[in-house]
Amino acid sequence: IINGKFGESGKIVLLEEKIDGPEISIFALCDGKKYILLPSAQDHKRVKENDKGLNTGGMGAYSPAPIVTDEIHEKILNQVMYPTMNGLIEEGSPYLGFLYAGLMIKDSEIKVLEFNCRFGDPETQPILFRLNSSLVELCNLAIDDKLDNYSIEWTEKHSCGVVIASAGYPEKYESNKEVSIKENNNEDLKLFHAGT
């Protein structure tokens, strides 16, 4: 906008409502006709502690999201997920795969920020860590249009994921650094790699 820094895309400005509040992620596995909701998760996008610094893809996440009370969960189902999934079916665009809704909660009101046709990162890791069923079996059931008679088993435990990033992330960051991790004998601790 200023001095043409953004080129053609900076010539038009779109003003939107500023919304504020905690952001949560809700995922559904869909087979084109039916869908199964996964537990909620909440990630933290700022690079520094106490919600400071630049936004990132996510510096950590936990599941379930404590802000998702029974009341909020019902609102999410009835105001967002059911209308979306049923709308896709009614319009002749049934969806097969994982659908991810990024939502913001403010004063018990739900605002939809985005929908993605994928899992979210880093929210997926804490969610899947709570899964007692086979992810491969779930995906195969979705492909075969057989989700209606399946019940996913989840642990009641809470799960947390922490991202460790190179110095300087998310801007110019160090690369080609050795990562050393002591042997992990704790079954409640899993290590996931990305960009290593």
Functional labels for PLM-detected ranges:
Residues 1-125:
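Internal nucleotide-binding/catalytic subdomain
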Residues 53, 62-66, 186-196:
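Glycine-rich phosphate/nucleotide-binding loop
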Residues 77-99, 116-189, 194:
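Active-site "cap" helix and flanking loop/linker of ATP-utilizing ligase/carboxylase catalytic domains
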